[in-house]
Swiss-Prot record:
The gene is MRPL57. It holds the Pfam family MRP-63. This is Large ribosomal subunit protein mL63. GO terms for biological process: mitochondrial translation. Its main location: mitochondrion. It comes from Bos taurus.
Length: 102
């Protein structure tokens, strides 16, 4: 029994690279270097994104005209899907050909 416990000790159960009790991968120097480079890029992005390009006064309403134009274009595109309005007078105008009293 002690021999079995001694021989089976320290073994990763099941597949050693997947699962809950998997074998941890060794971290190489290249992986550390890539992680440091990614963190530096993220820090620089955070630095630049923390400073606004426009002031609050400039930002207020700067896209109102563009949004209104886009809404009008959307409204026109939706209206283009429907047929044009037809009036009842135009629809029944052919009946006026034989009208004697006018």
């Amino acid at each position: 029994m002690f021999l079995t416990a001694l021989l089976c000790r320290g073994r990763i159960p099941g597949r050693q690279w997947i699962g809950k009790h998997r074998r941890p991968r060794t971290v190489s120097a290249l992986a550390k270097q890539n992680m440091i480079r990614r963190l530096e890029i993220e820090a620089e992005n955070h630095y630049w994104l923390s400073r606004p390009f426009l002031t609050a006064e400039q930002e207020r309403g700067h896209a109102a005209a563009r949004r209104a134009a886009a809404f009008e274009a959307l409204k026109a595109a939706q209206a283009a899907k429907f047929p044009a309005h037809r009036r009842l007078e135009d629809q029944l105008d052919h009946l006026n050909v034989t009208r004697k009293w006018s």
